[in-house]
Regions:
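Iron-sulfur (Fe-S) cluster-binding modules
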Residues: 1-11, 15, 19-21, 29-31, ...
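Ligand-binding loop in jelly-roll beta-barrel domains
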Residues: 64-67, 109-114, 139, 347-356
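C-terminal accessory/binding modules appended to enzymatic or scaffolding proteins
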Residues: 266-309
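Ferredoxin-reductase
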Residues: 1-94, 98, 111-114, 142, ...
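Residue-level marker of beta-strand positions
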Residues: 42, 68, 93-94, 289, ...
Length: 359
């Protein structure tokens, strides 16, 4: 079933840092199963701001056994929704919340102990915190190490919660704060999470090559750098999992070229969309994406970031051909299987059929 919105009541809004809040929601019993999540997934929130429909995706920061549905929102410059959330949302408000999505997930647990590593920067901690809480609660023999980059100690989101986990699980949870604008006693922990910093940290402090899984989350530049360092250390690419919060400047967007390199996307077309078992046809104007065509036609197709990162708009091309401009979230196997990000896809053929229900 495709993700869908429901109005949920805000249970609590907690100030985490000067520019970040966590928001928890009340989930009625009738929707409990719909909002059951896996650690690492995200919610898409929707609100009308200055007369415009604005939606943004935020990672769930609770563990699977915590009994709560909670996200964190960091205020960003020019961010309409992040400013709205930090300044206006209060306990008792109702907000449209899409059911959980995302495949930035923990590998299946097969028993015994495993060693996991996460590298996060800024608000990239949010899905990672949920993973850490889940593993520590469910896997008594497993270890989790976190390298967490921030500007200053005051800007660390969930600082107290992370320290509490360290005290609760000594020997199983290791946290290393790396600060770019504050000098720390350990020189290795002062500065940016760049290649010069990550290489010794992942060699001598956290033996990444021995990890059963490595999770990267935050700005694209950090993720690309960390991925390159891990590859250089010989970490199996299949064990590296990425969640982009912003694309890296100049980084490759992993989108395939259309089968016909000279394919014309600047022509009108027709798109048939399969959503929750129903079929609806929408006209697509020249140069228009599938998502924009659906919005213009008043069709409630899943989408959020419209930047090729969150994967909410994922669908499978059943008939015809599209050109996907950028892709920061689909795995290679998904692209091979015909899945696309409809916020980045424009019809190449006169008619296309896309299935949002395909798994």
């Amino acid at each position: 079933m495709s993700p869908r919105f429901h109005a949920l009541k805000v249970r609590e809004v907690k100030r985490e840092t000067a520019d970040a809040v966590s928001i928890s929601f009340e989930v009625p019993e009738s929707l409990r199963e719909s909002y059951r999540f896996s650690a690492g997934q995200y919610l898409t929130l929707r609100a009308t701001i200055d007369g415009a429909d604005v939606r943004r995706s935020y990672s769930i920061c609770a563990g699977e056994d915590d009994g709560e549905l909670r996200v964190a929102v960091k205020k960003v410059e020019g961010g309409a929704f992040s400013a709205y959330a930090n300044e206006n949302i209060r306990a008792g408000d109702e907000i449209d919340v899409m059911t959980p999505s995302g495949r930035f997930l923990l590998p299946a647990y097969e028993g015994g102990g495993r060693m996991l590593v996460a590298i996060a920067a800024g608000s990239g901690i949010t899905p990672v915190l949920g993973m850490i809480r889940t593993v520590l609660a469910r896997e008594p023999e497993s270890e989790f190490f976190l390298l967490y980059g921030n500007k200053t100690a005051q800007s660390i989101i969930f600082k107290e919660e992370i320290e509490d986990l360290k005290d609760l699980f000594p020997g199983r949870f290791g946290i290393f704060h790396v600060l770019s604008r504050e000098t720390q006693d350990v020189e290795m922990l002062s500065g940016r999470l760049d290649a010069d910093k990550l290489t010794p940290l992942l060699t001598h402090v956290v033996p990444a090559v021995e990890a059963d899984g490595v999770f990267l989350c935050g700005p694209g530049e950090m993720i690309e750098t960390a991925g390159a360092v891990l590859a250089g250390l010989g970490v199996d690419p299949a064990r590296i999992h990425r969640e982009f919060f912003t694309p890296a400047d100049g980084s490759p967007a992993h989108a395939p070229k259309p089968a016909h390199a000279d394919a014309d996307i600047d022509h009108a077309a027709s798109a048939e969309l399969v959503i929750d078992g129903a079929r609806v046809s929408v006209p697509v104007a020249a140069g228009e994406t599938i998502v924009d065509a659906a919005i213009r036609a008043g069709v409630e197709a899943p989408f959020s970031c419209k930047g090729g990162m969150c994967c909410t708009c994922r669908a499978k091309v059943v008939t015809g051909e599209v050109d996907m401009a950028v892709n920061y979230s689909l795995e290679p196997w998904e692209v091979e299987a015909g899945f696309v990000l409809t916020c980045q896809s424009r019809p190449v053929t006169d008619k296309v059929v896309l299935d949002y229900d395909a798994m």
